[in-house]
């Protein structure tokens, strides 16, 4: 298990919907796509991730083709990916901004 904190940066290349936490989870998913039994999550402690009403995402590694993941990453449209495949986390505004927190768990 890896637990991490901080605020990742995203180089915006498209005009999609998403935030740095959703994008980070999608980037990690692309990297570990061929591994088994891994859970990835990253959330904004203030409850707002980028230009969405979600705080982040949670997903298990799966069989989604890297080409599909790359399409959503190229347009910075991670929110649409998670709406389609599941995994969005919605906490609402927490009025508390410590930092982003994440988890990568091998089970």
Located regions from the model:
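Internal helix-turn-beta structural module
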Residues: 26-107
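A glycine- and small/hydrophobic-rich beta-loop-beta segment
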Residues: 1-21, 30, 34
């Amino acid at each position: 298990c890896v637990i991490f904190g901080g605020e990742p940066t995203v180089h915006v290349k498209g005009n999609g919907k998403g935030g740095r936490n959703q994008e980070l989870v999608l980037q990690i998913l692309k990297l570990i796509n061929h591994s088994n039994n891994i859970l990835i999550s990253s959330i904004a402690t203030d409850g707002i991730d980028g230009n969405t009403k979600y705080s982040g995402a949670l997903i298990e590694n799966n069989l989604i083709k890297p080409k599909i993941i790359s399409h959503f990453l190229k347009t910075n449209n991670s929110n649409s990916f998670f709406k389609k495949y599941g995994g969005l986390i919605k906490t609402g505004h927490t009025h508390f901004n410590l930092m982003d927190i994440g988890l990568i768990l091998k089970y």
